[in-house]
Structure formats: C-alpha cells, structure tokens
C-alpha cells in the first residue's frame, strides 16, 4: 500500500504474462492474424497499459465494445487498427472518422448511415460487417448478409472484415458451434475480399474451420482458461491481495458478519481484510470463497460486506496471519475461473469488476 492509501486491496497485473498469452494464442492460430479484445478497460487490467503491452508483443488489431473505449484505445495505440463491436450509434460517424476507428456494422440501418456518411465525405471508409449465426444479440442474419454481397448497399463502404461470435465454443462437440461454423463459412464465401473472423478465445483452439483469417481472443489473454475442464494453457495475469486489518480469536458459537450467517464450530481465529464488494469482490462468494495466507487456503466466513471480508485463519501460521500482512484472493493457485465458480458466476465478471479502489501495480 502507498503512504496515501494504506487501506484497500492491491491488484497486480503482469504485462509480461499478458504478452506471453498473446504469443501463445498467435501460435495456436497457425497463420491467422491474432487480434486482441481490450473492451471493458482491457477486462479490468487497464487499457492504457494492456494495449501497448500487446502492441509490443506484435498485436496490430484491437476490438473494443464502446466508442468511448475506442477513444482511449486510440490514445494508447496511435497506429493500431481498432474496431468497435457495438456498432454505429446514430450520429456518431464523424467521431469514428476523426479518430480512424472502424465500426462493426450489424444492421441495414447502420450500413445505410455509414454509407451515407462516406458518400457525403467523398471517402470510402473502412468498417466491419457483423453476421449473427446464433447469438441473437447484434448482427445481420445470414440471409441479410448474403443479400448484401455484390450489391449496391456496400459500394460506398470500404468493408474490410466479416465477423460473427461463437455461442459455446468452450463446449466440446457442441452442435450449436458446428452449425455456426457452417453458417459463417457459407456467408464468408460470398465475401471473398473480406478478412473473416469467427474464433474467440475458445474458438482459437477449434482448428482452422473456426479460425478463418483472424481470431479475436479476449478472456484467455488475461489468464482465463479457454478450455474449461482441461489444463489452462494461459499464464496468470492478475493477482489480488488485501491487507489484514485485525485478527481476533472467537469461542465456539460466536457469529461473524451481517445477519450472523456463520457460527464458529469451535475456537477459531478470524482475520478481517480491507476489501469488499465495493472493490468488485463478489458478495455472492460469501461462505464459499477462499483466500491464501502463507500457502494455506483459508475460507471466507460470514457475509462479504462493502469494505470488509472475514477469513478463518485458524490453520494459517500465526506469524503470517497478523495485522498488516497480506492475504491473496486471486493468485497462489486461486485462479480467476475458480474465484468465479465459487461466487456462482464466471471469471469474466470477476475480472471486469475488480480495481475500483484497488492500488494497481504493473509488472513490465
């Protein structure tokens, strides 16, 4: 902790591991370009630091969700190709053009607005086309996309990329994935001049049929397992530590936390951490989460509150479980996937919620 911020958690982000993960995914992609998804502040790791680290590793194409994220990405990555996945909000075309950003167009209305802007400017500006193959969120249907191929609707647009998004690529042998792969291949064949991109983190490991010319990993870059149920080929990127504020011994029958939802089964030693759900640590992990103190797994007891977490450190060495020491909530064998599972959610949500008040440290 710094002298001005002695409370709270410390989020350590290993940019060397981030770069190594990109290189591992690029190797797996076997000839396809490996882009990087850096939306949601690079999954909570900091777009201003993660983006340049990925650029230095060799990444040249980046994806974000919002225009505001793209503006931050452009400031950090002046030479990169940057696509905005959530498309073209009405009236936003000038901002895209002024910052050399590329919208991912997913409806006839967006295509018409972008084309009209290009005509008015006398420029054919680049954009991606989004075809929906099963997610039913954003994108043209396969039939709508096929109707555009070779037609006048795209004459004024420098369409550069065709994308879709896999629903459940992490599920081996998934029938929905097989159908998406086939539908996307059918549409991609009608746009031979466009780079095609289907594979996400898990899709990168599905072989050439799901990769096409570009893969777009996100979660795996930041240490998430792209193949749940199997060994994680990615290196951990994020570590979360919190300071122990106080240690106390409690007798059998003592309760801890709001609503007295935990009762000591015997004499226990409890440590209170300077961390809570206001820091993005999930309240849903109450009674299920764990932390590591001096190599020992210690259960979270009682209800996780806004600013504090209670650990049962009875089995941890007393010299380690003391005021001012640190407990590790992500790291030391506790990966983001496990933390998510213990909170009844996914590691993506854990990553993107962290760091609201945490001190950040980067390993370059």
Curated annotation (Swiss-Prot):
Q: Keywords assigned by UniProt? A: Isomerase, Pyridoxal phosphate
Residues of the active site? 39, 258
Q: Which GO terms describe its cellular component?
A: cytosol
- Annotated pathway: Amino-acid biosynthesis; D-alanine biosynthesis; D-alanine from L-alanine: step 1/1
Q: Which organism is it from?
A: Methylobacterium sp. (strain 4-46)
User: In its keyword annotation, does this UniProt entry include Cell division?
Assistant: no
User: Domain of life of the organism in this record?
Assistant: Bacteria
Q: Which CDD domains match?
A: PLPDE_III_AR
Instruction: List, alphabetically, the InterPro entries matched.
Output: Ala_racemase (IPR000821), Ala_racemase/Decarboxylase_C (IPR009006), Ala_racemase_C (IPR011079), Ala_racemase_N (IPR001608), PLP-binding_barrel (IPR029066)
Give the family this protein belongs to, as stated in its UniProt record: Belongs to the alanine racemase family.
Q: Which reaction does it catalyse?
A: L-alanine = D-alanine
Residues found modified as N6-(pyridoxal phosphate)lysine: 39
Which protein are we looking at? Alanine racemase
Q: What is its EC number?
A: 5.1.1.1
Q: Which GO terms describe its molecular function?
A: alanine racemase activity; pyridoxal phosphate binding
For binding substrate, which residues are annotated in this chain's numbering? 137, 306
| Cofactor(s) the record lists | pyridoxal 5'-phosphate
Q: Pfam families in the record, alphabetically? A: Ala_racemase_C, Ala_racemase_N
Endpoints of the signal sequence: none
């Amino acid at each position: 902790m710094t002298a001005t911020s002695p409370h709270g958690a410390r989020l350590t982000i290993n940019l060397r591991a981030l770069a190594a993960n990109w290189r591992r995914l690029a190797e797996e992609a076997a000839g396809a370009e490996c882009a990087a998804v850096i939306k949601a502040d690079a999954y909570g790791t900091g777009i201003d630091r993660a983006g340049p680290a990925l650029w230095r590793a060799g990444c040249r194409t980046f994806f974000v969700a919002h225009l505001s994220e793209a503006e931050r990405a452009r400031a950090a990555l002046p030479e990169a190709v940057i696509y905005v996945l959530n498309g073209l909000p009405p009236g936003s075309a000038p901002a895209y053009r002024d910052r050399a950003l590329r919208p991912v167009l997913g409806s006839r209305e967006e295509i018409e607005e972008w084309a009209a802007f290009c005509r008015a400017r006398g420029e054919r500006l680049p954009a991606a086309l989004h075809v929906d193959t099963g997610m039913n969120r954003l994108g043209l249907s396969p039939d709508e996309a096929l109707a555009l191929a070779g037609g006048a609707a795209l004459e004024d647009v420098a369409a550069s990329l065709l994308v879709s998004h896999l629903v459940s690529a992490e599920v081996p042998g998934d029938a929905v994935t097989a159908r998406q792969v086939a539908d996307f291949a059918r549409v991609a064949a009608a746009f031979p001049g466009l780079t095609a991109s289907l594979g996400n983190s898990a899709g990168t490991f599905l072989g050439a049929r799901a990769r096409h010319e570009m893969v777009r990993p996100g979660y795996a870059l930041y240490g998430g397992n792209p193949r749940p149920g199997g060994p994680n080929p990615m290196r951990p990127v994020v570590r979360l530590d919190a300071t122990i504020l106080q240690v106390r011994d409690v007798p059998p029958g003592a309760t801890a936390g709001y609503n007295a939802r935990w009762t000591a089964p015997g004499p226990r030693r409890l440590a209170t951490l300077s961390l809570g759900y206001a820091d993005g640590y999930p309240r849903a992990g109450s009674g299920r989460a764990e932390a590591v103190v001096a190599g020992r797994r210690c259960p979270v007891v009682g209800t996780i509150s806004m600013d504090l977490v209670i650990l049962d450190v009875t089995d941890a060495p007393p010299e380690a479980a003391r005021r001012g020491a640190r407990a590790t909530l992500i790291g030391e064998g506790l990966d983001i996937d496990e933390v998510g599972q213990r909170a009844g959610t996914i590691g993506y949500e854990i990553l993107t919620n962290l760091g609201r008040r945490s001190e950040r440290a980067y390993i370059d």
